[in-house]
């Protein structure tokens, strides 16, 4: 099984799972640009950077799955996703969880609480800038309907 996961926002990265080995490539280290954002460069540059990243870890651009951690639930997301579909060779795709949902899971599962409300607020993500979740040990964090 070969899986590639991309995040194209600030501090972009690519993660590759290749038959039991996980490799993470921080693209700002590859490009030399602090806080590099793959989503803010042309499709040609995206292709070149992804090719360079995969060459660095000696992995072919041929994957069973692409985990798209960037473009769903965002304005103009469909266009950006189509660009990446033409760069990454994959058989199926799934969408990564929301930015704030990841914050909520990180906070809740490290807490001592059995039940909790979690507020996540920052500069933004693919799921907004301010989210509220409720959590139990059985369900984990779930979006609280307002």
Enumerate the language-model features and the residues they cover:
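Short acidic/glycine-rich loops and adjacent helix/strand connectors
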Residues: 1-146
């Amino acid at each position: 099984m070969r899986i590639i996961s991309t995040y194209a926002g600030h501090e972009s990265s690519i993660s590759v799972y290749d038959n039991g080995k996980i490799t993470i490539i921080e693209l700002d280290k590859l490009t030399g640009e602090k806080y590099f954002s793959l989503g803010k460069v042309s499709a040609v540059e995206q292709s070149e950077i992804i090719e360079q990243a995969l060459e660095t870890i000696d992995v072919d651009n041929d994957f069973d799955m692409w985990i798209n951690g960037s473009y769903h639930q965002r304005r103009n997301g469909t266009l950006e996703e189509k660009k990446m579909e033409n760069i990454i060779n994959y058989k199926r795709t799934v969408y990564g969880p929301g930015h704030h949902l990841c914050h909520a899971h990180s906070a809740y599962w490290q807490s001592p609480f059995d039940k909790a409300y979690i507020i996540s607020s920052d500069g933004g993500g693919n799921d907004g800038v301010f989210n509220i979740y409720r959590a139990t040990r059985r369900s984990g964090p779930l979006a609280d309907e307002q």
